[in-house]
UniProtKB/Swiss-Prot annotation:
Signal peptide: none annotated. This is Ribosomal RNA large subunit methyltransferase K/L. It comes from the Bacteria. HAMAP family: 23SrRNA_methyltr_KL (MF_01858). Specifically methylates the guanine in position 2445 (m2G2445) and the guanine in position 2069 (m7G2069) of 23S rRNA. Belongs to the methyltransferase superfamily. RlmKL family. GO terms for cellular component: cytoplasm. GO terms for molecular function: 23S rRNA (guanine(2445)-N(2))-methyltransferase activity; nucleic acid binding; rRNA (guanine-N7-)-methyltransferase activity. PROSITE patterns: UPF0020 (PS01261). It comes from Alcanivorax borkumensis (strain ATCC 700651 / DSM 11573 / NCIMB 13689 / SK2). Keywords: Cytoplasm, Methyltransferase, rRNA processing, S-adenosyl-L-methionine, Transferase. Its main location: cytoplasm. Its EC number is 2.1.1.173, 2.1.1.264. It is found in: Cytoplasm.
Length: 704
């Protein structure tokens, strides 16, 4: 007898291998099917044991007819009374080939009218004799569907999360990497487990249980060609396999959503593998080296970023996965499902193998990666000597850069700092700031007054760039030049370009995105480094609130430090999107780390939540279309009072301001315990300007 096992398009080679391992005689492998020959027992074996098959079809007829007569001809080609069991309803599915016009429902009605009158027609495959037909231009095909309901319905997953993974696809992912084969892997982690399908299938495969061990209904039960005793024997063998214990392998499923994990626990319970799997609410960024054991693999279905606005976040989440594996589990492999090869390659890992498939409307990839060895970041520092010949006019700046570099060298090494300010308008004739971002240099020229000859200003600018290159020994491509002038309102955030070229730098244990092309500001205020690092130290187990959050770098530090919840508030969509990417680059999602686009003052008026740790760094001045403008000198008292209403007893507010003539509202000091930590909060590389910002730790009086 000739049978066809169907699968997702692109997985037929994997299915063919699986059927061969079951002792099935494969005769043909297509893109979405595998043909095999054998007896009824072989067909039942595939139905019960194959984890990759979607359906098992018995070929009944192929007729050389056109679609206008095909339904009646197909119906007339079979002795239905000898094919269908007594009183069994018939479930029919007819599909049209791509070139066949017309409604397939009309073809189905014509087929049904041509069947013997005693047959009842059912809309449901369960409990029915299932017939499938396909009409092409010059051919018509007829099959008996021995599976009935699709075989991915194992019986344990009654509900899924936001993007549930089909069981057959999960099994194909695992089969691709040889999961369950002796000596291949001793551990499996799914950091995006959702409702648990991948890790549950991994447990069932490791135990050697039949895919259909828990299923009670198949299409072949209503087929006269299947003897009842044959079915009972096959069912008994499959059922007994369902009692096999899961061997001693490490199986872990992590997810950020508690409700989804609850589904995973319920599904694992129904599958009989609950005690074999460790499920935990934890985000990718919270995985530690101890979570990985030798000879393991990470499998997962990370967010694809199918919507355009989600694509950057998905890419940075893949980046985080690659970085985490390279640092914490360099011996692991990663087997990932995705829809965009470019997004998946953002992981930075080495691509070992891939499979292409069609998953409903999506073109998908299964990709096997291995981590790349993590190389230390190259942080540019002042060189002891230089091959550059600088103009005489640039020599004073070169000397000052070398002096500053020598002063900062030991501090930079001791504190392990990648991003710092090397020079800040120390010399009147060089009105620039020089910031180092790992292996890149940002030179910010403060626009010369109109009284200065433009040609002279340009010459000084060129000298500055030459001196920087000579002092640091960098190529021209590593130096980024910007011109700043006195800003009004939100002009400091004005767009310069639209290249979207983000780079990653490290601060403490956090990975932060900077942009040296598109905006005047890079996305990271270097002078707040000590405060951000303190937030990371204090955040464990706390609820963190970040107001006027900009790109959310403080939020990232809180998340990396173990905050149980964070809320990030800013009025700019652009910077909240940036914050989302910052979180993703560290392995955190916006499920547990809320991003709120809102006016901060109004958001505080409506806030009902309490926080243990708050960071607020308001601008000196901010335009607002929906209310009066925000002026920090006038409004900071009201702002702080609103924040303190949301601050839990025992909590602390870190309030910062870069207004040079700032003076704290006296009423704040009367009502709250205010500690001026400005001197502590200004790092060594900014000590030349003690008014770069003011910073205060504010607590409730009873906590002081």
């Amino acid at each position: 007898m000739e049978f066809v096992a169907t699968c997702m398009p692109g997985l037929a080679d994997l299915l063919s291998d699986e059927l061969g391992s079951l002792g099935i005689s494969v005769t043909e492998t297509g893109r979405a099917h595998v043909s095999f020959s054998g007896g009824v027992a072989d067909a039942l074996k595939v139905c019960l044991w194959s984890r990759l098959s979607e359906r098992v079809l018995l070929h009944l007829a192929t007729l050389g007819v056109t679609p206008d007569i095909a339904p009646e001809k197909l119906a007339a080609s079979q002795d239905w009374l000898s094919l269908v069991g007594n009183n069994a309803p018939v479930h029919l599915h007819i599909e049209h080939g791509a070139e066949v016009r017309g409604d397939n429902r009309i073809s189905a009605k014509r087929f049904i009218h041509a069947l013997p009158e005693q047959f009842a027609i059912s809309r449901e495959p369960k409990g029915s004799c299932c017939i499938r037909a396909r009409l092409d231009l010059n051919e018509a095909h007829l099959w008996l569907d021995l599976a009935g309901e699709p075989l991915h319905r194992r019986g344990y997953r009654l509900a899924g999360g936001r993007a549930p993974l089909r069981e057959t696809l999960a099994a194909a992912i695992l089969w691709a990497v040889g999961w369950g084969k002796e000596g291949r892997h001793s551990a499996l982690i799914d950091p995006f487990c959702g409702s648990g399908t991948l890790v549950i299938e991994a447990a069932l495969i490791a135990a050697g249980r039949a895919a259909g061990a828990q299923r009670q209904h198949y299409g072949f039960q209503q087929w006269r060609g299947c003897r009842r005793q044959l079915w009972l024997d096959a069912q008994k063998e499959a059922g007994e396999s369902g009692k096999r214990p899961v061997p001693a392998v490490s199986l872990k499923g992590f997810d950020s959503e508690a409700s989804t994990l609850q589904l995973a626990l319920q599904n694992a319970e129904r599958a009989g593998v609950r005690n074999a799997i460790h499920f935990e609410r934890r985000e990718l960024g919270a995985l530690r080296r101890r979570d990985f054991v030798d000879n393991g693999i990470v499998v997962g279905n990370p967010p694809w970023g199918e919507r355009l606005e989600e694509k950057p976040q998905a890419g940075w989440l893949h980046y985080a996965l690659g970085r985490i594996l390279s640092v914490r589990a360099p011996g692991y492999q990663a087997l990932l499902l995705g829809a965009d090869a470019e997004v998946m390659d953002r992981s930075g890992m080495n691509l070992e193998q891939q499979w292409r498939l069609k998953n409903g409307p999506f073109n998908n990839f299964i990709r096997l990666y291995s981590p790349r060895k993590q190389t230390p970041a190259n942080v540019v520092k002042v060189a002891d000597d230089s091959a550059f010949n600088v103009p005489e006019g640039a020599q004073p700046l070169l000397n000052r850069l070398r002096k500053n570099g020598k002063h900062l060298r030991r501090w930079l090494e001791r504190e392990d700092i990648q991003c710092y300010r090397l020079y800040d308008r120390d010399l009147p004739e060089f009105n620039v700031a020089v910031d180092i971002y790992a292996d890149q240099v940002l030179v910010q020229e403060f626009k010369a007054p109109k009284t200065i000859d433009p040609e002279k200003a340009k010459e000084r600018r060129d000298w500055a760039v030459t001196a920087v290159r000579a002092a640091l020994g960098v190529h021209r491509e590593q130096v980024h030049l910007r011109t700043r002038e006195k800003q009004k309102g939100n002009q400091q955030y004005q767009k310069l370009d639209a290249q979207g070229q983000y780079r990653v730098v490290r601060e403490g244990q956090s990975q932060l995105l900077i942009n040296l092309q598109d905006y005047l500001d890079t996305g990271l205020f270097l002078d707040h480094r000590p405060t951000r690092l303190r937030i990371a130290e204090e955040a464990s187990g706390k609820r963190f609130l970040n107001l006027f959050a900009y790109t959310g770098s403080a939020t990232v530090h809180a998340a990396v430090g173990g905050a149980k919840r964070t809320v990030t508030v800013d009025s700019s969509k652009r910077y909240l999107d940036w914050a989302a990417c910052n979180l993703a680059a560290n392995g955190f999602s916006t499920d547990q780390h809320e991003l709120a686009r809102a006016d901060t003052m109004r958001w505080l008026d409506e806030c009902k939540e309490q926080f243990d740790l708050v960071f607020c760094d308001p601008p000196t001045f901010s335009n607002n279309k929906s209310r009066s403008d925000f002026v920090v000198e006038e409004h900071h008292g009201d702002l702080i009072r609103k924040i303190m209403r949301c601050l839990e007893p025992g909590g602390v507010l870190y309030f910062s301001c870069n207004y040079r003539r700032f003076q704290m509202d006296e009423s704040i000091s009367k009502w709250y315990a205010v500690e001026d930590i400005s001197r502590w909060s200004i790092p060594e590389d900014f000590r030349r300007n003690e008014k770069i910002h003011y910073c205060y730790a504010i607590r409730h009086v009873e906590d002081a």
